[in-house]
Amino acid sequence: MTQHDPLHPLDVTFLLHAAELLPGDPQVDDYGPLYAAVARVNARALERDIYGSLYLRAAALLQTLVRLPCLEHSNDAFAWHCAEAYLVLNGCRLDYPPKEAVALVRDVASGAMGVGLVGRQLRAWSVS
């Protein structure tokens, strides 16, 4: 696997399954953000991936789901869980302090961190 070729591309089914695993099994209020997240992560222009690494793809996924809530509750937890699960599914395990992950999600929600910074942080937490 190279960082440019995910073994498992993102799809809406993956995101829906991730939502089912959250405490309280929150229902989807709006499917639009799920499809937007998938389209963004898989986006290509001029025959090149917009997000050239798994870490940038996971960062774009996290940002999209945090900034465009789609569940009846637990949207921040959902966004983090999806980003981490996407990395793990593609062979990239993370090791991070939970409080720092919470702070990262808050910074994404506030607009203080963009995709590039989030991608670098995810890469820094990678242990595989």
Please name every model-derived segment.
Residues M1-S128:
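FIC/Doc superfamily catalytic core
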